Structures are given as C-alpha cells and as structure tokens.
C-alpha cells in the first residue's frame, strides 16, 4: 500500500533547459512552478550547476520569493564560484554560498561534478563524511533541512546518521533500470528492489527521513512508493516528458495518483 505522506517535489531543470536553448525568458520558471503547485505538487526542486546550463542563480531567488511550498535546492556542496561571462546571467557564487543566501526548506547535497550530464551515484561517506559534517551543521543552524544523495547501502546509511543529516535521498537509477527489465530478469529486479526496501526500513530505525529520486516515472513509481518511510520523491525529466503528452497539470496529478495521494 502506498503512503499518503509521500510528497511530490517537481524538478524544474528541464523547463529551464528548454528556456536556455533559445536564451529567452520563456518558458517562465516561476510560472511553471506555480502551475505545478496549482495542480497539487507539494514542493519544487532545482539543481543549479556552476555552468548554469539549466537552472540559474536568479531562478533560485525568484522561486524563493514566490513559493508557498517547500523549495529543495540540490547540488554539489564543494562546487566553487564561477563567472557566467553572460550579461543576462548572474555569476555562480558557489553552491553552499547560494544555499545560505536563499535559505530553502531543504538542501540536498549531491556528489556530482560540473561535467556530469546528470547525477549518477551517491556519496561514499567513508571518503567525504568528515568534510560534509561541518557543512551539514552550518546549514542546519540556518534552519535548512539537509538531505544526502545516497545509494541503497545499509553501511553508508548508518554513516549518514553519524554525521547528523536529517534525511537521505536514495539514488533510484538502478531501480529504474531493473524495473524496465523485470519481465526478462525478474529475480534481479526483486533483488534490487529488496535493497531499496531494506534501506527504507533501516532509515526508519535510525530516525532518518527518506527521499528518493532519479528516473522515477509513471510506470515504476507505484511499486517504489511501497517502500516504508518514503517522505518525498523528486521527479523532473519523466514528468516533463509526460507533460508534453498530457499537459503539465495532468502530469502532476498523474504522479500524485501513482503515489496514492
């Protein structure tokens, strides 16, 4: 049975990518955020990378000013400042500096670099835990809830608890891939799903909030939403693709229905 408490946060990066492809002011990020909210989205997610190839610094400020729902800003906590070299685009101040200025409801720390097309792995806290601890503490002092992008590895999840993060966001790429092939390799799918399910159980035992995201779509979401302790899913690419076919409002409603909301 799906949980009625699983929030849907819509990632707007693909909307920004369409806008930036023509260097225009439309589609409007704030307008589309409001359309998502009016259709029932519980939150908005953005991932401003240093090169600002989709979401830009100014988008983050604009969204923070108008949103009446939670804003989740994702990014690499070690991303440094970068000049934009474009008159209409503000310089990137560094990820953590941007988050401290915006003060979103949630900040999701992700171990990607500026050359990655998309996020494709979680933190290895045996390597980065000591560096992340003071960052997490600084953000929490500002009233920002912190989530770490993680893989469904129980030992890593226990380490996440030790550095006092509020939540973890499970990287669901492997689940989505296994789901696509579940008719051909059902045993492999069940093995992968069991890893995610166990991760949800461990997170609950540790009193860690559980988020999830990456490649979730209308086909695979309902099954994933049976995982215990799932508080939020962040979905952008697939929802944007579905919006082309069904319309944005209908796409948001369809995802909420898949969550059982």
For each predicted feature, which ranges?
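Catalytic cores of alpha/beta
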Residues: 80-101, 153-163, 212, 216-230
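C-terminal helical cap(s) of enzyme catalytic domains, especially alpha/beta-barrels
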Residues: 121, 180-189, 242-261
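Conserved N-terminal beta1-alpha1 strand-loop-helix module at the mouth
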Residues: 1-79, 83-91, 100-102, 159-162, ...
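Hydrophobic faces of well-ordered beta-strands that scaffold small-molecule active sites
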Residues: 6-12, 44-46, 69-75, 105-109, ...
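Alpha-helix-loop-beta-strand connector modules within alpha/beta enzyme cores
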Residues: 53-78, 125-147, 188-212, 218, ...
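N-terminal small/glycine-rich loop or linker at the start of catalytic domains
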Residues: 2-22, 111, 117-121, 132-141
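Histidine/lysine/aspartate-rich catalytic loop segments that bind and position anionic ligands
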Residues: 114, 145, 151-202
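Glycine-rich phosphate-binding active-site loops on the catalytic face of alpha/beta enzymes
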Residues: 47, 108-115, 167-180, 228-248
């Amino acid at each position: 049975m799906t949980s009625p408490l699983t929030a849907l946060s819509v990632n707007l990066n693909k909307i920004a990518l369409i806008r930036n492809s023509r260097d225009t002011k439309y589609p409007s990020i704030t307008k589309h955020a409001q359309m998502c909210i009016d259709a029932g989205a519980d939150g908005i997610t953005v991932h401003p990378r240093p090169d600002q190839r989709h979401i830009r610094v100014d988008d983050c400020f604009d969204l923070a000013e108008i949103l009446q729902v939670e804003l989740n800003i994702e990014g690499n906590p070690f991303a440094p400042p970068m000049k934009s070299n474009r008159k209409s685009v503000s310089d990137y101040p560094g990820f953590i500096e941007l988050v401290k200025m915006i003060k979103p409801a949630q900040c999701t720390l992700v171990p990607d670099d500026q050359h990655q097309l998309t996020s494709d792995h979680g933190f290895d806290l045996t390597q980065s835990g000591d560096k992340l601890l003071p960052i997490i503490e600084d953000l929490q002092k500002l009233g920002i809830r912190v989530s770490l992008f993680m893989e469904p590895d129980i030992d890593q999840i226990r380490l996440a608890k030790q550095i006092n993060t509020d939540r973890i966001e499970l990287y669901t790429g492997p689940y989505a891939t296994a789901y696509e092939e579940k008719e051909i390799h059902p045993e492999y799918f069940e093995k992968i799903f069991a890893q995610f399910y166990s991760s949800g159980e461990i997170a609950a035992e540790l009193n860690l909030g559980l988020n999830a995201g990456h490649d979730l779509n209308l086909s695979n979401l309902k099954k994933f939403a049976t995982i215990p302790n799932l508080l939020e899913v962040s979905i952008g690419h697939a929802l944007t693709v579905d919006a082309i076919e069904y319309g944005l409002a209908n796409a948001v409603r369809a995802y909420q229905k898949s969550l059982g909301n």
